């Protein structure tokens, strides 16, 4: 996360090339892999914190990080009959600036062990942008906004881009501002792992963990609609 223009993070130099032997087990396993390169990205605990402009940063308490959102997304996808592996490894354990290298190592190991996943999701949260609403209201409750980031250096990035754009379309049928945008960036974000790879920013550090979880339910709904069609 944290890849908004105003709050760029030093992510480009640490991204690893895809190991040559990853195709040792090239059978597609039909599962989704959800993981978190920036595992400790945190959300607010309460709406009162937002009112007080106490924006979240990082925490090891997974009840208030992107891991919690990943748990919600996992549960929601499984209700649609989609099998999921949710990797909650702390990819920041070797240092924040090595997070992409660490996550690539982890997802490569899981791919070698389990076969190629049908879809890889790196789930983040963004950084708050001043004077921009972080939530939308659906059925009377606040839901975190969503965005997608596509690395244009990934060999088959156009497939990832098409998937992200279709996801945006479906989410914005639910609410016209639920998905803010699809951002293309000149790097790969480890999306060279597959031509079915998404980096999803669910909310930012001005939303609560609960609001992010609500968004994850809608992300699952859109993913389920595209299951067997685009991935």
Annotate each predicted stretch with a short phrase.
Residues 181-231:
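Active-site-adjacent mobile loop/cap segments within catalytic or ligand-binding domains
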Residues 31-36, 83-85, 119-124, 145-149, ...:
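Soluble periplasmic/extracytoplasmic beta-strand elements of cell-envelope proteins
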Residues 53-56, 129-155, 164:
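A short, glycine/acidic-enriched catalytic loop
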Residues 55-66, 89-100, 150-158, 201-210:
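Second-shell loop/turn segments in exported
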Residues 58-133:
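Catalytic-core regions of hydrolytic enzymes
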Residues 1-37, 42-46:
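Non-catalytic propeptide/linker segments at domain boundaries
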Residues 156-183:
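Active-site-adjacent substrate-binding region
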């Amino acid at each position: 996360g944290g890849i908004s223009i105003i709050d760029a993070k030093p992510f480009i130099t640490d991204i690893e090339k895809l190991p040559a032997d990853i195709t040792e087990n090239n059978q597609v396993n039909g599962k989704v892999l959800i993981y978190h390169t920036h595992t400790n990205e945190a959300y607010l605990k309460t709406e009162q914190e937002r009112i007080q402009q106490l924006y979240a940063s990082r925490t090891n308490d997974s009840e208030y990080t992107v891991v919690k959102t990943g748990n919600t997304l996992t549960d929601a996808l499984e209700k649609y009959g989609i099998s999921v592996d949710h990797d909650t490894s702390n990819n920041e354990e070797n240092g924040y600036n090595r997070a992409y290298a660490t996550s690539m190592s982890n997802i490569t190991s899981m791919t070698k062990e389990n076969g190629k996943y049908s879809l890889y999701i790196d789930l983040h949260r963004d950084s708050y942008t001043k004077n921009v609403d972080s939530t939308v209201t659906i059925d009377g409750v606040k839901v975190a906004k969503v965005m997608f980031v596509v690395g244009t250096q990934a060999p088959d990035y156009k497939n990832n881009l098409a998937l992200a754009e279709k996801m945006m379309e479906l989410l914005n049928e639910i609410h016209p501002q639920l998905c803010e945008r699809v951002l293309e960036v000149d790097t790969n974000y480890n999306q060279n792992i597959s031509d079915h790879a998404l980096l999803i920013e669910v909310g930012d550090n001005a939303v609560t963990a609960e609001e992010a979880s609500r968004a994850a339910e809608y992300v699952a709904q859109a993913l389920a609609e595209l299951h067997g069609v685009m991935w």
